[in-house]
Amino acid sequence: MRILLVNYRYFISGGPEKYMFNIKKMLEDNGHEVIPFSIHSNKNVETEYSKYFVEPIGSRDATYFEECKKTPKVIWQMLTRSIYSTEVEKAIKKEIKDVKPDLVYIIHFVNKLSPSVICGAKKMGVPVVLRLSDYFLLCPRFDFMYNKKPCEECLTKGYRTCIK
């Protein structure tokens, strides 16, 4: 099976990336072909598929948003990549068209690639598996915490409660 593996980093920076490279190896050891889709970074593991990767928010040297210079362009990119990115959708559709995966497996896309990776895959008719390892779909902070206390207001009152 050809699997397009989507993550917003293609280098180890923490747990999700360790998981990604471990699952990639396990899948390959079991006879599957695993093809990455990610963001350009100077820290990326080399891959022939980097030609499909999208430009990062800010700089290819920055791993975290805090490392980026907060220009209006960077802030705009951060806001739009949180919601939707035509650039990302176009790039993933191009890679899907060229490599013809049987499945898209998404590890992490939040705030860097956007949900457009899901839309692009669905528009191309490729099934999507989305790994959920935190609460990002339900809580903008990812952890249901506010002022070091449990908070579930987004579940009952919606996202507007996170803007106080």
Task: Enumerate the predicted regions with their spans.
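Acceptor-binding helix/loop patch of EC 2.4 sugar-transfer enzymes
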Residues: 68-75, 132-164
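Short N-terminal targeting/anchoring amphipathic segment
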Residues: 93-113, 127-131
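A conserved catalytic-core segment of Leloir-type glycosyltransferases
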Residues: 29-103, 144
